[in-house]
Structure formats: C-alpha cells, structure tokens
UniProtKB/Swiss-Prot annotation:
Keywords: Glycoprotein, Membrane, Repeat, Secreted, Signal. Residues 106-117 have a biased composition (Pro residues). This is Rhoptry neck protein 4. One of its GO terms (cellular component) is membrane. It comes from Toxoplasma gondii.
C-alpha cells in the first residue's frame, strides 16, 4: 500500500522520517537529544533547558486480547504540557525502522481489527518526539512449561517470548529459527513469525534492505486468531485483567542496562541434579539458554559414569585421596639415574681397591657371600661393603692390634665372640688364622668349643620383595608423593649390616676415646718428627672432624692453665705460637685428607670450624654422664659447662682466635689469576699464594717476606705467616723418609719454612717492626715453642691419644694438672724489638736492575737479583759481595758515561752515608761490598760514573741525595777475579 500524501512541508517531513529513520526539523534546527540506557543520565541541551514545551517521552506497549487495541502512552513530560501518542498499526505495508535516533516508536499489530493506515503526525509532534532505542533481544528458557529455548524481544519494558530450536553451534541459525516458527504455526502453537525474524506479537524488527510482507503477516494473524493455544488464552486473559499503565524504567534484572549491540555470552554447564548430559549455556541480555550437547569421547572420563558413581554413594562420602585411575606396575618405578651414578662411582673405587689390595677385596666378597662379578645395587649394599671392608681391616689388617686395645675390655668379648659364632661357617678358616696371627690376644675369643648362639637367623628379604613385585598396586596420590623406587633384590645369604662387627667396634671406641670415623692407617715417620717419646706412627687417614674435636679440648686446657686476671696473650710467645700453629695444622691436615680423596674439597675450612667450636665451647662440651661407665654427676657437669662457656668468651680466647684465623688465612689463600681464583690444595701452596712469589729461588722468597712485613702494619698477619712456615717445616720433616704413597704426597705438600726464615734473616734485618713478630719469625727464638705445639697437636693423630687416655682426662675437666707440652707450660716473655733499619747504602745489599742494550736502566719494578740471573744481563762493572736481597729501599747501581776523571774516594762514600736517615756505616765498610779493580787510564778509554741514587722511604719522595764518583775504566769489560767470583 502506498502512502497518499501531498509533498508539502509537513508531508515531506513525515516521508523523510519514515524512510531515513531520523528526525528532520525545518526551522529552527534543533539537535536531536541522544538516547542513553538510563534517561536520568541524558544531558539536556541549552534549548531544552530554556524551552518549557520540550517533552521527553518513552513508548509503552500493552498487548490486548482479541477485539482490543494496543495503546501507546508517553511518560510524564518534563514541562507543563502533556501529550499522549497513540498509534494503531494494522496491515500497513510500510514499516518504520526502529533504529537509534528515530522519532517514532515501532508499530504494534492489533488483533481482530482491519488494517488501516497509520495517522500522520503534525509537524510539532514530530519535532518534539525524542528518538527511541531499538528493541533489545535476548534469549530465555521457559522452565515452567518445559518448552524449548526462546527468543526474547524487548521494547518499552514489555517482553515477547518466541520459542526457538536448539542450535548446532553457539548462536542459533536464522533459517532454522524461521522454519521452527513456521512449523509452530502449522501445529497450532498460536505464534507466527515473519521473514524478517520478528513475531506478530511483538514489535517488528525488519532486516536491513528487505521490506516486510504484510500479506503473509495478516494471514498468520488470522490463523492465530482462529486457532488460539492454551498458553495464548491464558496470556490474553491476564492482559485483559491488567489496566494499561505507563512504562516503568527498566531494571537491571530485566537486562535493560545491557547495550543493544552486546554479543551473547556462552559457557558450558553440567546438570548433575537431573542426570542429563552436558550442555551449552548461552547468555544474552541477562538470560541464559541451556542447549543439551552429547558427552565427549576424548581424554576426559565420561561424566555419566562419574555422576552415577556419585549418586550411588551419596550416603558414604568419598575420602580426599580417592583416585579413579589405577594401573598395574609389576616392577614399580625405578629411578635409574641414582643407581647408575652409584654403580659408576663404586666401580671406580673398586678398580683402585682391586689394583692395590686384591686379597683384601677377595676377603670382603667372601665375607659378604657375593659372587666375584657382583656390584652393589643400592646405597645399603654399598654401606655393607664399606663396613665389611673396615671389618676385615680391623680383624686382619695392620690396625687390628690397635683396635683390639682401643676397645674397652668389657666389650671385647661381646664383639669378637659374636663375630666368630656368626661367621665361622661362612668365612674360610684361613681368615680366623690370619686374625690370630695379626693379634694373638684375639685367639681366646675364637674358641670352637663354645656353642653357636641360638639366635634365629633373620630371613632375607628376597621372598618378600619378590611377592611384593608380583602384586600389582594402584598408584594413588601420585601428585603428592615421590616416585617409588624399586630396590633390586639382594644376593642370597647376604649378611645384614647389623651382623657386621665394625659398627659395634666404632661405637665402643668412640665412647672411650672420642669420635672415630675410619679405621686407622698407621704410617711410620722419620726419627726427626716431633712426636711423643716412643711413638713413631701417624694415622694419615684420621678424619678432620676427629682432629678438630681433639684439638679443641687441648686448646681449652692450655688457655685454662695460662688464664690470669690481667694476662695478655701477646706477653706469652709460647701461647702465641700454640694458637698460630693450630690454624695452620688443621688446614694442612684437611688438605692431606682431600689429597687422599677421603674428604670432599668443598667442605668448610678447618680453621673456621675450629674457631666456631672455641667460641661456643659450652655448646660442644661433653655429656653429663660417662658413656663407658654410665655414671653421672649433673651438678659437676653444670659447673664445668659454665666455666668452659666463660673461658670461650674470655679476652685470652679472643686473642687466640685472632692468631688462629691469621695462620688459617695464609694456609687457605687462593691463587688469583685476575679472572678467577683457584683454591690452595696444600699448605705450601697457600704460603706461596700469600707471598705471591714462586719458591724457585730463596732470594725472591726472602724479599717477598720483607715486602709482606711492610705491607701489613699489624703483627698478627706476620705472625700467621711465620707460624704457617714453621708448621709446614715440621710436617716436611716427618714425611721426608717416604715409604708409602701417602708419605710422598704429604712431603710435597709442605715447604721447609724454617730455612726460608733463616735465609730472610741473613741480611741481619729483623722481620717486621713489632717485638712479637720479630720473635715469632726468628726460628732461633721461637723454634722450641712451635716444636712443642706440633708435638701437642700430633698427639691427636698418633697412638698417644688412646694410650695416655687423654680424652677421659680432658673431658672430665677436673682440677688435675696435665703437663702435655713441657715447653709450653712456662710463660715465655717476648724479647724487646730490634730497630728495623733500612739502609740506603748502594754498596750494601742492593737491587740489581736490568740493563738495556742502549745503556738505560729499567724501571724500579723490574728488579733482578744476583742469585740465578745470567751474566749477560748483570752489570759487569759492579761486583756485589755477600748476601744480596733486592729491596725497594735500596740504591740503584748502573754504569753510565763518565762525567769526570776523578777517582772515587772514601769521602764520597761517607757523604752518601751522611745523607741517610739511619746510622751510617764507616767509610771503609761502605766500599767493602763493592770491589772495583782500578786500572791505568788509556787513550781512548770510556769513562764511567757510579751513581748512588738514594731515596729514603721515611723522607719526602721528592728529596734526593745524589753523589757522583767517576771511575777510570777501560772500554773493555773488566773481568771478575777468581776470589770475587768464589765469594759470589
């Protein structure tokens, strides 16, 4: 139907409004107000605030039953005027667009009324009508009637629900929606749809660019009128009973706050209550649409089985650790990396052991009942092998006699008798015969007449493990526990570790004499070694922790004897020697254990552990009872502990710790290459790294000692260096007669420090400025104290500790006096310091510089000393006699061109001596060390001058004393005399 209207001003305005969907105003142009979801948020324009006739209206649609009309009423106006717009659209072939910005509301069809054209509006009404928002569409579910999903369209606060079929995807297809709506009309559902996707009961929402078909819409309206459904009758009756009211503001629950263009949201849910399958949940405009979907067949379990299990066990709640998956694991879970690394390490150890001690390895295998090619499979078997190795060493080794005597007599019968009764049928008879040959005293416990103990032998775990391996077990709670490790089955008849006697021996010796980690390996030492009287062996495998435990008790006892109220450690050079020797001794011992691959190189430094034990002596004190006898005196123990704690915090102990640290730092000084630091592996290496000088020449070492003394002003640094040097010399003496591989290793790990100090003192210059450092660094004064300290500390690694029962005497902390080192008992006063002069005479111990081809001397940093340098780089005109030690404080001697023909005289030398700040030497002594052979002057002889450039370190560096003494020499080099060469 075409709209008949004259193209006048008002008619043209209406036509443009219907076609374009926008409000066209003539004069004056007024901007159209913007629509907002909330009308209270819409700002008013300037014109609307000034003009009282501006209205703000919204559409309200009431659906009436048949024979009724749908009315449209506006909201209350903002001004004084009221306007009510009513439009009845029935069968109009032109439908206005309901887009944002239009001034007309969407048409609503009227049931039971013949179609008639919509009334035209006046120009004023069209200008005052604000644009309305497009109807919103959402999806909802009618759970009450059990119908399918539906489409919900909303306009002006009224909702129209249209059933839609379940879609295959997330969003429904329009074709399926249209076909479903048409089928509902044919079945008498009372609801019809148009091709544009809208319904006849709700506002028309035509598709863009497609005009609606009014003829089909009328036919569907008539069919719905003729065949109403019960649902439509019920809704119609409800609408008749409700009077028409104005549209209320939309609430958040109705989805009015959602913007028109918001996309529907989709999620997945499971209806566990009704037992249905999983579903797809679509949400649009605040409503949810649930579409059933089939259960998945992927990696996830079937939800129906899980739901049925939960429904069947509702009465009994499931525990938290219930798992739904289990599998049979006959062999368990094996961590092959651990077993592989264990086998590789043990195989290397066994190779070395088999090469050095093949008979001992064979005895161990017989002891354990293993075949010749068997290797331990787990850590327990490795420990069994080590215990068996220690047992054979304790029974038939060189330490068998010592171990037998170290075990308390009341425990010997239990250990040796039980061992014989347990293994006399498993070990060959030759084993027990060898044990009796090494230690005849043990034969009394190897008596065949004694009946074997009726102790039932514990069966091996082979049967139990095999049964457990065949039974499949579910892997439950695999996320919270580590992987199960399947230990290989032990060999048949393997002796358990509890039956091996070595742990019992170790425990018995530790109770009586302190901790014992390994079986001793007694190595003979030379007669010049500073050991106790009658002792000639050292246990080279003694653990560092055992040595630290014993030395701690020794130092506490010595400080306790010398502790006074006002005494100072620096006043007793014997105690200073003891403390400085302790740090070097324990570090050197740790280096030796690491060289034998008995300890890990990454362990903490030994001197640091010793300091920590001494500072916290109260925490490391003995137990309140005697482990050997079981007797206890708690009151005495509490008193002793308080005294030891007080001694550990005393000033004397703090001073001792200072010197322990100084010598320990020297022993562990790493080598700094500039880019990396390499730790020292021996006491010899630590001393060389501290001096930063190779020990290829004693002259260089002597110079480095003096340089080190100048660099460090405090005496403890120099005391630590000298203490490490002297202790290293005593170690070298002990292992100089190398009879074993361990002795050879220890010999090369040390240096004869006493010889180095003597060579340094050959210049008749003391080392350092302090009286204490001069006394400690002089072997002629302090050698006796360092020898006593070494003798005291060596008792911890010799048989003297067990024979003299030192552990019981030191741990009891009684008032009984113990004289362990006679040379350390009396207080040794420190002699006064000697003046540490630095001569500036060029004719005494001078530095020798390298002479370039051009005759220039090199920089003072490139110093060459006399010992060991080739004659081609030595100054040939200068003959230096006596010990020469290069020193930065010495004068420089180099040949230059002559400046005068005046011969050298004693006055020049005396003038040079007077320029020095030290006591000058006589003139005749000034030239005593400088031998120059005068010769007759020749015609074309070169003239040389001997310059003495003296700069005293105690004076200003800019002040120089320069004396020239020309000498007559030939152009040929003066040959050195035989007598002078012999003196060099």
């Amino acid at each position: 139907m075409a709209i008949k209207n004259t193209l006048t001003g008002s008619g043209l305005l209406v036509l443009l409004t219907l076609a374009c969907g926008t409000t066209v105003q003539s004069s004056p142009p007024t901007p159209a107000p913007r629509m907002y979801p909330n009308m209270n948020e819409r700002p008013l324009s300037a014109e609307s605030r000034l003009t009282p006739g501006t209205y703000r209206s919204e559409l309200h649609i009431d659906l009436k039953s048949p024979q009724k009309t749908a009315s449209q009423s506006s909201l209350a106006p903002t001004g004084d005027n009221n306007s009510k717009v009513e439009s009845i659209i029935a069968g109009s072939d032109t439908t206005p667009r309901s887009a944002e910005g239009t001034s007309e509301s969407p048409p609503v069809p009227q049931l039971g009324t013949p179609p008639r054209p919509a009334p035209r509006r006046s120009k004023g009404e069209g200008e005052r009508q604000p644009p309305t928002a497009a109807p919103r569409t959402s999806r909802s579910v009618d759970t009450g009637s059990g119908s399918d999903a539906s489409t919900e369209q909303q306009a002006g606060g009224q909702k129209v629900v249209t059933p839609i079929p379940a879609s295959k995807g997330i969003y429904p297809s329009l074709d399926e929606l249209r076909r479903s709506q048409e089928s509902n009309v044919d079945a008498g559902s009372g609801t019809s749809t148009n091709e544009g996707g809208g319904t006849s009961e709700g506002p028309q929402v035509p598709q863009s660019g497609i005009p609606p078909r009014t003829g089909r819409r009328r036919a569907k309206a008539r069919n719905r009128k003729r065949h109403p459904t019960p649902a439509s009758r019920e809704s119609s009756s409800e609408d008749e009973n409700q009077p028409p009211t104005t549209a209320s503001r939309p609430s958040n629950g109705e989805g009015e706050s959602q913007p028109p263009t918001a996309a529907p949201r989709t999620s997945r849910s499971v209806d566990t209550g009704s037992g249905s399958d999983a579903s797809t949940e679509q949400q649009a405009g605040g409503q949810k649409v649930v579409t059933p979907i089939p259960a998945s067949k992927g990696i996830y379990p079937n939800l129906d089985e899980l739901r049925q299990t939960q429904e069947g066990e509702e009465s009994a709640p499931q525990p938290a650790d219930v798992t739904w998956f289990s599998m049979s694991v006959p062999m368990g879970v094996v961590d092959r990396r651990v077993s592989r690394a264990l086998k590789e390490q043990f195989f290397q150890f066994l190779q070395h052991l088999s090469a050095d001690y093949p008979k001992q390895v064979q005895t161990v295998y017989e002891f354990l009942g293993w075949v010749a090619d068997k290797l331990p499979e787990n850590e327990e078997e490795v420990q069994m092998f080590i215990d068996a190795l220690n047992t054979t060493e304790a029974m038939v080794g060189k330490a068998a006699r010592w171990i037998f005597k170290a075990i308390p007599e009341r425990e010997r019968e239990t250990i040796y008798s039980s061992f014989y009764q347990m293994f006399r049928d498993k070990l060959p008879k030759k084993f027990f015969e060898t044990a009796e040959g090494m230690n005849p005293d043990v034969g009394q416990y190897f008596s065949a007449e004694e009946p074997v103990a009726v102790t039932p032998e514990i069966p091996a775990k082979s049967e139990e493990d095999s049964e457990a391996a065949e039974t499949p077990t579910p892997l439950r709670r695999q996320a919270n526990v580590a992987a199960q490790v399947l230990h290989p089955l032990p060999a048949k008849g393997v002796t358990r570790r509890e039956w091996i006697p070595w742990p019992k021996m170790q425990n018995a010796i530790s109770k009586a004499h302190g901790p014992l980690t390994r079986v001793p390996e007694w190595t003979p030492v030379t007669g010049s070694c500073a050991l106790g009287d009658g002792y000639t062996d050292i246990d080279v495998t003694k653990a560092t922790t055992d040595v630290l435990f014993r030395i701690t008790l020794l130092i506490l006892q010595q400080i306790r004897r010398k502790k006074t109220e006002r005494g100072k450690l620096e006043d007793d050079q014997a105690l200073v020697a003891l403390c400085s020797a302790a740090g070097a001794f324990v570090d050197a011992w740790q280096h030796q254990q690491q060289a034998l691959i008995l300890e890990d190189p990454g362990t903490p430094k030994a001197h640091a552990q010793l300091i920590e034990r001494l500072r916290n002596a109260g925490k490391y004190f003995m137990k309140s009872y005697d482990e050997t006898t079981g007797e206890s005196d708690h009151q005495q123990w509490k008193k002793n502990k308080a005294e030891v704690s007080k001694l550990g915090k005393s000033a004397l102990m703090k001073s001792c710790v200072k010197y322990i640290k100084a010598s320990g730092d020297v022993a562990t000084r790493p080598f700094d290459s500039g880019t990396a630091k390499y730790p020292s592996r021996s006491l010899y290496g630590g001393i060389a790294n501290t001096l930063e000088t190779p020990f290829a020449d004693s002259e260089a070492v002597a110079k480095a000692v003096h340089d080190y003394a100048k660099e460090h002003k405090k005496p403890e640094k120099l005391v630590g260096l000298c203490g490490a040097l002297q202790i290293s010399g005593y170690f070298k003496k002990c292992f100089s007669d190398a009879g074993r591989l361990s002795s050879v290793s220890f010999f090369h790990q040390h240096v004869d420090g006493a010889s180095v100090l003597v060579r340094t003192l050959a210049r008749e210059r003391p080392i350092g400025r302090h009286a204490l450092s001069q006394a400690i660094c002089d072997p002629n004064i302090s050698a006796q104290y360092f020898e006593g300290a070494f003798r005291l500390f060596s008792s911890t690694v010799s048989q003297e500790w067990e024979k003299e029962n030192l552990f019981a005497q030191l741990a009891s902390w009684t008032g009984k006096e113990m004289v362990l080192a006679p040379s350390l008992e009396e207080q040794a006063a420190v002699p006064p310091a000697q003046p540490a002069y630095e001569t500036v005479y060029g004719d005494e111990e001078d530095r020798i510089y390298r002479i370039h081809v051009s005759g220039r001397h090199s920089s003072p940093q490139e110093v060459l000393y006399v010992g060991g340098i080739p004659s081609t780089v030595k100054p040939q005109q200068v003959h230096v006699l006596g010990p020469t030690v290069s020193d930065e404080s010495r004068r420089m001697i180099h040949p230059v061109r002559h400046r005068s023909r005046t011969a050298p005289s004693s006055e020049a030398a005396s003038t040079a001596a007077e320029s020095s700040d030290e006591d000058p030497l006589p003139a005749e002594n000034a030239t005593a060390f400088l031998g120059v052979t005068p010769q007759e002057e020749e015609s074309d002889a070169y003239k040389h001058t001997l310059d003495f450039d003296a700069v005293s370190p105690r004076k200003n560096k800019n002040k120089e004393n320069r004396i020239s003494a020309p000498l007559k020499q030939s152009d040929t080099l003066i040959e050195e005399s035989t007598s002078k060469t012999s003196e060099l």
